[in-house]
Amino acid sequence: MIVVLDFGSQYTQLIARRLRESGIYAEIVPFFESTENIQKKAPKGLILSGGPASVYAKDAYTPSEKIFDLNLPILGICYGMQYLVDFFGGAVACANEQEFGKAALEIIQDSVIFKGVKAKSLVWMSHMDKVITLPKGFTTIAKSPNSLHCAIESGKVFGLQFHPEVIQSEEGGKILENFALLVCGCEKTWGMQNFAQKEMTRLKEKISDARVLCAVSGGVDSTVVATLLHRAIKDNLIAVFVDHGLLRKNEKEKVQAMFKDLQIPLNTIDAKEIFLSKLKGVSEPELKRKIIGETFIEVFEKEAKKHHLKGKIEFLAQGTLYPDVIESVSVKGPSKVIKSHHNVGGLPEWMDFKLIEPLRELFKDEVRLLGKELGVSQDFLMRHPFPGPGLAVRILGEVSESKIKCLQEADFIFIEELKKANLYDKVWQAFCVLLNAHSVGVMGDNRTYENAICLRAVDASDGMTASFSHLGHSFLEKVSNRITNEVSGINRVVYDITSKPPGTIEWE
């Protein structure tokens, strides 16, 4: 096991993800985690992540110096490397030539972490400071055109100025694997088969004879949660699917059919009127999310009372993932809150259930692998992510039945055309957004003043970062023509070419 100390880098989660892809378990803790807590995890090595601060600044992020008393191998990445240099007596200063993006790495000395790594490769840089002087006992093992000390080592302490965790670093995964396997002595024991077995055992012990209400949205995450729980506790699971009126076209029927195939009893609740009445007049995104979160719990509590004769319901299960938690609140380090997730920040304080989130520490690709391990169909597992608040966060401004219908039809056309063109499985996520703006148009000889639809498609590997999908002009033209001709109330279609960062994948 490797413990990653998070200093606030946007890429910290990718470090854990890359190691897990290699079968090595990695866990993330904030940089200020106590040495005692780290020691309890019994790690075989530490990785210090990158971060936005400068080691020479007054407010620099510094971990407990006691981490060095653990006598564990340490790998510092970007800020982590600069911290090591500063701590051991070297010098770090603001770089005259800052590096952002791809750079050419050249290995200049053999090292165990470079075993099997090409002598020259491209790596990903993202730093404004650089190492000026190495501490005594350290050696430079790689360089780049603008970084003479691009990789350093001293015994079992290593530093990398670049980000091996980012996919653009061609040999990054191999370097991280070498550190974990060859330096730290880790073994490849992490995988979804082991996770499924251990998690089912944990769930059985935690839940015991209690009953669990599982919130099913129809998405991959909640479906995998329900399947995992059903394997673990059988009839003590009450799977509840709430039709809040904010679903995609034909969503309810698809979900019911899929759960029937999985042989999991599903309780469907028609709560459309309740949700829409509470959302009436509400246009602020965060308020919409919180209203939906609170209304979900209200509906679940009512459903729980219907089942009380069969045993008390103590737990509420949700399909919360790592990125959900990261975007809601900084639980792993000094990153900043972006927006609340309906599974986390939107929950009311008066909630009576104990929360259980089996997937909380998993990335999306791991959830799909887990689902495959549990027997969920591949076609379903490859469905694009869908937000818990549903179309409410894809309708900018106030939500209404007419807007929902309009968005459902447009979204259905977009997805249908992606599948016809064999593009659906090539993009990470695709959907439509109904904008809160009207524009002038012409239909026949008549002037129109109607809604605009925005098409959104992104490429990503885990949702932490994303770039817009480069869909062909002819394809976009076809989708636009269909939407404006077939969907009443739409006279303009635009395509979102914003990446994440600076934007988020969803608009609200």
UniProtKB/Swiss-Prot annotation:
Name of the protein in question: GMP synthase [glutamine-hydrolyzing]
Top-level taxonomy: Bacteria, Pseudomonadati, Campylobacterota, Epsilonproteobacteria, Campylobacterales
Keyword Transferase: no
Positions annotated to bind ATP: S217, G218, G219, V220, D221, S222, T223
Function: Catalyzes the synthesis of GMP from XMP.
Pathway field: Purine metabolism; GMP biosynthesis; GMP from XMP (L-Gln route): step 1/1
Residues annotated as domain Glutamine amidotransferase type-1: 1-189
GO MF annotation terms: ATP binding; GMP synthase activity
This protein's record includes keyword Isomerase: no
Swiss-Prot/TrEMBL catalytic activity: XMP + L-glutamine + ATP + H2O = GMP + L-glutamate + AMP + diphosphate + 2 H(+)
Chain ranges of the GMPS ATP-PPase domain: 190-383
Active site positions, chain numbering: C78, H163, E165
Alphabetical keyword list: ATP-binding, Glutamine amidotransferase, GMP biosynthesis, Ligase, Nucleotide-binding, Purine biosynthesis
CDD domains in the record: GATase1_GMP_Synthase (cd01742), GMP_synthase_C (cd01997)
EC number: 6.3.5.2
Superkingdom assignment: Bacteria
Assembly and oligomerization: Homodimer.
PROSITE patterns, alphabetized: GATASE_TYPE_1, GMPS_ATP_PPASE
A GO cellular component entry from the record: cytosol
